[in-house]
Amino acid sequence: MKVVAASRLIEAQIRYPSAHEHIQGWYQIMSNTDFHSPEDLRKVFGDMRGFNSSFKFPIPESKLLARTLINFAAQVVLIDDVVPGNH
């Protein structure tokens, strides 16, 4: 998928340095995989939550969530933010 606003991931890596590698790993999976449905996402990210085009992914080994908007037809994921929280 094409990851849009990846600069938000870089900002999160600066704000949360202990999660740097896990955020990078999440980005690598998203940018190198074609997901065609929420079910495809769940096969890889079992703990994610989603509704319509809005999806939240917990970042492993942290208390962070990547909040995204995904258009499966266009194969685009927009990074809304990476924030502390739970889903």
Annotate the PLM regions:
Residues M1-K63, N71-L78, V82-H87:
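Basic, Lys/Arg-enriched alpha-helical interface segments
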